[in-house]
Amino acid sequence: AGHFGVTCPSFAKSIGIVLFVASVGLIAGPKFFHNFKHNFKSYVILGFCIIIAGGLCTAAICLIGNVNGALAAGLLSGALTSTPGFAAAQEAAGSAKDIVSVGYGIAYPFGVIGVVLFVQLMPKILKVDMAKERAKLAEDAGNAPKSFKTKGLIAVDSLGMMPLCLTIVLGLIIGLIKIPLPGGAFFSLGTSGGPLIAGLLIGHIVHIGPIDLKPKKSVMECMREFGLILFLIGAGCEGGAGFVDTLIEQGPILFVYGMIMTLVPMIVGYLFAKKVLKLPILNNMGALCGGMTSTPALGSLIQVAGTDDVASAYASTYPIALVTVVLVEQMIVLLF
């Protein structure tokens, strides 16, 4: 639709991603911290490994394909669908920031589609027993959600929209916090990471004093799906606009480079998590979505797995990948 001139307001994509990650956080919150403590080292190592693999792949393409550093950084940020990485690359590129935008636009569509297809197809190819894997994931996350006494608590509304609104406000505030990094860049969780962290925290504590903050799960699932639809519509229109023209003008080889930058870190991350870290398949896939900073893939994985528990692995790996990709983007621009 984007290729044929259909436009979507930019705020629709932003609203969609905020609704999606806030709802996911609230649903996954009760089990998140146990899973995080149990697999903390694995998630940190995996998030770092995925982005470094992408960086090394990009460096190789720069050397072998004689690709400009700013263009390569744009391709990598698109391949990893990383807006913070894209912003860091533009800042480092200075006057060449338009070249970064070209690379981002070429690699972004496959960056979204590639990870989504991977998490959908791999369980089917491996003939994974989802019921068995869900049981493993539930056991890893603490067997059962925390049990809370709700008697005597004040429910502000029956649907739990107040906790969702509180999560969104708190999440946006968290997302605005900027932490300085070497090279003059800044790290922030943004509209995707901030509401997710806020949702996990509020989903974990469940109440503040006498006020009940436990949302109705069915409502959160509805908001999660609605948010994902909005986000994908916005991302699709944005990615499709000018994609074909840019591809024809710049040459299909850049699209191939973008595909490689998506596939290599994704496959390396999957194999590393499976062979070295020995993570179960759903932990592996959830952490892979976080390491690839792919929110659409998380939505797809939740559908495939039939459980929101995979969001714990995503949320644990995502911040590590976010910081690393910002640093790697700067290095690529400066070195090549």
Model-derived segments and spans:
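Structural signature of multi-pass alpha-helical membrane transport proteins
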Residues: 1-10, 19, 150, 161-219
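Hydrophobic transmembrane alpha-helices of secondary-active transporters
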Residues: 3, 9-39, 197-210, 220-247
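Transmembrane helix-loop junctions at the membrane interface of multipass transporters and ion channels
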Residues: 3, 7, 31-32, 64-66, ...
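Structural signature of hydrophobic alpha-helical transmembrane segments
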Residues: 7-22, 70-77, 186-200, 226, ...
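Cytoplasmic-side transmembrane-helix entry/capping segments in multi-pass membrane proteins
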Residues: 12-20, 38-50, 72-77, 190, ...
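Entry/N-cap segments of selected transmembrane alpha helices
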Residues: 30-58, 108, 241-267, 318-319
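Alpha-helical membrane segments and immediately flanking helix-loop junctions
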Residues: 61, 65-109, 277-320
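Intrinsically disordered, low-complexity non-transmembrane regions of multi-pass membrane transporters
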Residues: 123-164, 210-211
